Amino acid sequence: GDTLASNHVSSAAELSANVPNLQATSTLGENIPIFSLRGVSMSDFSVNQQSPVATYFDEVYKGSFPFIPIGLYDLERLEVLRGPQGTLYGKNTTGGAVNFISRLPQFENEGYLSLGYGNYNRMDANGALNVALGDTTAARLAFTFARRDGWFKNRVPGEPDLNQVRNYAIRGTIRTK
């Protein structure tokens, strides 16, 4: 998680440069990746197609592409398992599995905030607030925000520029002992 943050990896498609043998294409949007491991991928890109590289978020299977949108924020770690994983994860893992593990609430008060600004009026913010609610319960609220103007001018009146970014996500977690 910290390695991804220090390398400024903000979308699943950017993982290819940081994880050996993992390729990610984004034909359906920046945060809806199609993973390929060691050359095993899929050739049909219909929305109900199941990939041979399974995607999990906190060990919950994300099957069809519309249910995969993934924001890489406040992650504890990323697990990439190469090769068939049918014994561990079951179906749709002939090419491998990618498991995104988010940070769990800790039993102490802490938080962080990261802000950024870039070209094409890009603004980024992400952070988390962790609160201990007594000795046995803790809560964590994490968020991410990314906005960038498009760099292709759309000549259609009233329509936004092409390739703009508008990503917003929030995640709340409660943990008890």
Where are these regions (language model features)?
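Short, polar/charged loop or turn motifs at beta-strand boundaries
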Residues: G1-V9, L37-G39, F57-D58, L115-Y117, ...
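Short acidic/polar hinge/loop motifs at secondary-structure boundaries
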Residues: F45-S46, P52-P84
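N-terminal periplasmic accessory domains that precede
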Residues: I34-S36, Y56, R77-V80, N92-L115, ...
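Transmembrane beta-barrel wall of Gram-negative outer-membrane proteins
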Residues: E110-Y112, Y117-K177
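Extracytoplasmic
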Residues: N7-S10, V19, E30-I32, Q50-P52, ...
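N-terminal Sec signal peptide and the immediately downstream disordered periplasmic leader
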Residues: G1-N7, A12-N18, N130
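Extracytoplasmic beta-strand/coil segments of soluble accessory domains associated
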Residues: A13, A17-V60
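Non-catalytic regulatory/gating segments with a bias toward low-complexity or hydrophobic composition
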Residues: L4, S16, L78-G83, V98-F100, ...
